[in-house]
Swiss-Prot record:
It comes from Dehalococcoides mccartyi (strain ATCC BAA-2100 / JCM 16839 / KCTC 5957 / BAV1). GO terms for molecular function: rRNA (guanine-N7-)-methyltransferase activity. Keywords: Cytoplasm, Methyltransferase, rRNA processing, S-adenosyl-L-methionine, Transferase. Gene3D superfamilies: Vaccinia Virus protein VP39. One of its GO terms (cellular component) is cytosol. InterPro entries: rRNA_ssu_MeTfrase_G (IPR003682), SAM-dependent_MTases_sf (IPR029063). It is found in: Cytoplasm. This is Ribosomal RNA small subunit methyltransferase G. Coiled coil: none annotated. SUPFAM superfamilies: S-adenosyl-L-methionine-dependent methyltransferases. Its EC number is 2.1.1.-.
Length: 235
């Protein structure tokens, strides 16, 4: 885990032996499971350390606290939620993943990593956000999903409690995308708080963290039915 350790040193973070072992186990299980179902195209040891593990942990640049109640929307293979949980074991973590095979991997890897305080939710975000057990219950919501910011706002902000935040990793020039998302962010009860540049070893490719803050309740009609936020973004 030399690449990860080096990258984390730029953040002033060091891993103990337990955490290093967890990341090693995560890598081995990810590659093994990936041979059976498609979790990721990134499987080389060095690349996983940088493009999955370090990229996930880079969210600490947004000021993550160790006692967050965090929901990872469209978690896939567990990024960024599980690396953040390894780093901050006291986080209460929800991993929202609609694809059953991926959700099964998340359940298995959580056990193998010895993590507690993790809930796997295998449902669509649009449906889950209308459930009072999850709606406006989280201090922090993340999503690495490849989606337009207007769509992401509708799929993430309804989960945020007032005062909570969404952290959405993005790459490249996002000014036009953020302009398009302004209506959706406002309708969901949010505001664009800030955009943080990510400049870490191996991640010098224009990565950014978009931070949204929840400032008012999301109206009951949002999010719309499954599939609609992606097909017809609020722009």
């Amino acid at each position: 885990m030399n690449e990860l350790v080096y990258g984390l040193s730029a953040l002033g973070i060091s891993l103990n032996s337990v955490q290093l072992g967890q990341f090693e186990t995560y890598y081995q299980e990810l590659v093994d499971y990936n041979s059976r179902i498609n979790l990721t195209a990134i499987t080389e040891y060095k690349d996983v350390q940088i493009k999955h593990f370090l990229d996930s942990v880079s969210l600490v640049l947004a000021g993550i606290k160790g006692d967050e109640k965090l929901l990872d929307v469209g978690s896939g293979a567990g990024f960024p939620g599980l690396p953040l949980k390894i780093l901050f074991p006291a986080i209460q973590l929800g991993l929202l993943e609609a694809t059953q095979k991926k959700a099964r991997f998340l359940s298995e890897i959580t056990v193998k990593l010895g993590l507690s305080g993790v809930e796997i939710i295998s449902q669509r975000a649009e449906d889950t956000a209308q459930n009072p057990l999850y709606r406006q219950k989280y201090s922090l919501v993340t999503s690495r999903a490849v989606a337009d910011m207007a769509t992401l706002a509708e799929l993430t902000l309804p989960f945020c409690a007032i005062g909570g935040r969404v952290i959405a990793p993005k790459k490249g020039d996002i000014e036009e995308e953020m302009d398009r998302a302004a209506t959706a962010v406002k309708k969901m009860g949010g505001r664009v708080f800030k955009v943080i540049k990510v400049e870490l070893p191996g991640l010098e490719d224009g990565r950014k963290l978009v931070l949204l803050e929840k400032i008012s309740n999301t109206p009951a009609l949002y999010p719309r039915r499954a599939g609609i936020p992606a097909k017809t973004p609020l722009i």
